[in-house]
Structure formats: structure tokens, C-alpha cells
Amino acid sequence: MLASPTASLHAADKPEQAQAPEPAAEKRVITSHVLTTAKGAKLPYTATAGTLLLKDKQGKPGASLFYVAYTVAPKAGERRPVTFFYNGGPGSSSIWLHMASFAPVRVPVDVEAQGREGGGRMPRLASNPDSLLDTTDMVFLDAVGTGYSRALDPQGGKLYWGNDQDAAAFTQAIRRYVEINNRWLSPKYLFGESYGTTRSAMVSYKLIDSGMPVDGVILMSSILNFAQRAPGLDRMDINYLPSYAATAWYHGKVGRGTGLETHVARARQFAQGPYAAALAKGQDIGAQERESVIAQMASLTGLSSDYLRQADLHVSPDRFRKELLRDRGAVTGGFDTRFTGSEGDNAADTAQSDPADDAISGAIIANFSAYLAHDLGYAPDGDYVVNTPTLFPVWDWSHMPPGGPRQNAMANVAIDLGAAMRRAPQMRVLSLSGYYDLSTPFFATEFDLAHLYLPSALRSKLISRYYASGHMLYLDGETFNEVTRDVRAFISAKPN
């Protein structure tokens, strides 16, 4: 999940500042539990809440990284996989994946009930019979400055707040976990959501480059190329359009009698064809072609021809979310455009809030606080920081790609992912995308994954799956079941 200023248990008002170093010791609190799986089997497991010590370039303690691991004792001769999970932001803890997806406990958020204004009671944490624990051990990691992860260096978190810095920290943390738990021979998977996919692309290459094999990378709601978002470029307009079309279809604005995937397929063709050609011509486009594109765009997105004419074919996500349902006095969500809400100013140009985020944050945060204390018995040293949204202004967005001659001002980590796959041909990639996600539109992911520059023999290692859901694919029952099935099959598959 991208960092949200509303999602906070003990929100940080500003990035973590320099502080006196704490004792450089790793903590571990271990508890035993039993999960009843969907098949009725009893699965004993261990939950470990603890910290991993990260060292700086001088070998001194630099940060303490918090994690929660769920492990099952292997059978004789078994090498159980281990999967490392993290959310994104940058500046988000792993609370969302941890509490709402594949762990042995889950907050069953009801998207439909929570999405209606005033609808839905707060769900309670419960055992998760569909947990992936029967398939893989799981480790949920919090980035430095989030969760209970803290900087120990006198410079505070500045050493960790950047693309390359963050990737180096997670690489070190994963290696440290593998070392202290003797998981060298275990199949290893990375599971990142949102900016976590950015992290996974970089970390996969760094781990492989350091001699640690990575068997698979799972990308949920990807953002791999920040350079596409630079002002003046048309690529993101093209990338958003199929998601606009899916949203308009869901809310009954277009596509009567047409299925979602058929409507989205038409939007893909239009976006990559006539729409891309029109944007490339800029002000040189002819009047007849312009009107033809406007008419097609209106039929796909549900926006009026007059509005598209005034917008000159360029519609930002916040403008779209406000305009689509303006006649109903409603605004759609951004993380999940199926959600709707109301705002005080219906005449505003852009959406000022995100109903999708507002609907889910409270339930997950409240349950997590109780779970840590009562079930895991973890006594923290301070507050759990769910999100640190103010990391954005101080984040170092530059990136040195593998073999690159210079630092790029804006990261394109598709380069890293492609390099990792070429370097380690056994590594597979599973991409998971939601049609109703305007935070990381699926068409942008398609573009990036089509530019990994893989030899034909490796193309089969790249698998893409799509769902009628938003950014956080695990937040409604039907999609959660589909995603769980696909991830379980991916991890369980035998290497070829």
C-alpha cells in the first residue's frame, strides 16, 4: 500500500530524528499456536516477534528492524520455502499484508459493507484457515522508521530513506534472518505490495548478486518505473485509461451488456492505439481526429465529451475520481475505485479524500494493536508507527541500476528485475494486479513487464494475473480466494 496520511496507530508527525543509540541487541519473543486449515488439518506453528540488527558500512549498529515470522517444523527431508513480506509507501509498515492477507490470523474486512457510507461493523481478528502457512513459512518485515523498526545511528533514519538505501537494508535483513535461522537451503520468495514491488525488484538482484538464490518474486499492485510519472510525459495518461474504463464499467456508466474483461480489452487497444497516437501529436492533432478520440474515450470512461474536450484529453486520477460520479454527488476511491463517498464540495475539480482508505484503516489498526500484546506477547520499546507519510519529501528517489554508468534521478527498477531474471534463470515472477486500482494501474505494470528485455526462454518465467479488485487485492472474499490460490500454486510449483 502506498503511504496514506490517515492510516496510523501512533502516526509520526515527522521523519524519525537523530536519537541516542539503543543497546545493540536482537530481541525474540516466541509463542506456539495451532492453525486449523481449510481442509480441517491441525497445523502447529511458531510465531516469532523480534528484531534484526542492521550494521552500517563501518560495521556498527545502524538500525533495528522489526519482524514477525510464522514457521512450521519441517518434515524429515523437507525444505520448506520461506517468503518475506512487506508493504510499501515508502514509509508504510507491513501491517496491511500482515493483518489482512495470508498470515495464520486475519482481519476479514468486508469490502462491500465497509465501502457503503456508514456500512459495516468493525471486523475482529480471527484464525485464517486459508493462510499460506501450509505452503510456506512467512516473515513480515517493517522498514526502518515504521512499525517497531528504529534507526540506531546518530544520523537517524537518513541512512535508510532512499531507494538504494532501503533496498540495501532489506537485503541485509533478509540475509540476517536466513543466517540466524539456518535457512540457507530453503527456497526463498519475496512478496512486495505497491512500493514493496519496487523494493523487491532491487532486493532480488542484490541478493542474487551477493550469492543468495531467490526462487521467486511476487509483485502485488506494482510500481516499477517512476520515470514514467515525470511531468510532460504522456505514458501515465495511457496507463490510467484502462483503469478508468474498468471503473466506469463497475459503476454502470458504460459497457451495458458487455463483460468487464471485454470492456477492458477494448480500452487497452484504444489506449495503446488511437489515444497514444493522439497524445503524441499534441497540439498538432487535427480537429477530426481529436473529436474521434474524444468520442471513443467518452464511450470507454464514462466522462462526457465536453469534459474531455475541456481537459484536452488529459485526465488525472483525482479529477477522474471526482468527475465520474459527480452527478450522483459521489467520489470514488483511489486505492479501490469500487468504494464511493461524499465530500463537502461537489463542485471541486479533484477528489480530496479516498473512501477506500477511510473504510479499512481503523479495523486493521485496532486489531493489530491487540494482537501484538495479547497473542504474541511482544512488549515494545515505543509506539508502533503504521505509516510515516512525511518520508516522501526527504526520500532519495534516485537509483543506481545494475551495471549503470550513473545514478538515475528517478528509478526504473524493471531494469533490476530483468537483470535478476537473466542472472538467475531459475527465478520466476508472479504479477498480481487489480482492475480497480488507480494507485498502481495495471496497464503500467504490463508496459514495464514487457520491457524486461528477457530472452525468449525466460518469458515463461513471468506470469501475470488480474482480479476484479483494487490496490489491496486481499480485502474482499472472492478475490482473496483467487489470489491465495494463485500464490499457493506459484510457490508450490516445481522448478522447470
Write out the residue ranges for each language-model feature:
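N-terminal cap/lid subdomain of alpha/beta-hydrolase-fold enzymes
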Residues: 12-17, 59-159
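Glycine-rich nucleophile elbow surrounding the catalytic serine of serine-hydrolase chemistry
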Residues: 192-205
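Alpha/beta-hydrolase fold nucleophile elbow
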Residues: 183-194
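Active-site-adjacent alpha-helix of alpha/beta-hydrolase-fold enzymes
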Residues: 438-461
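Alpha/beta-hydrolase active-site loop
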Residues: 133, 143, 160-178
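Alpha/beta-hydrolase fold catalytic core
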Residues: 284-439
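A catalytic-pocket lid/entrance helix-loop region that shapes and gates access to the active site
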Residues: 104-108, 206-302
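Catalytic histidine-centered segment of alpha/beta-hydrolase-like enzymes
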Residues: 468-479
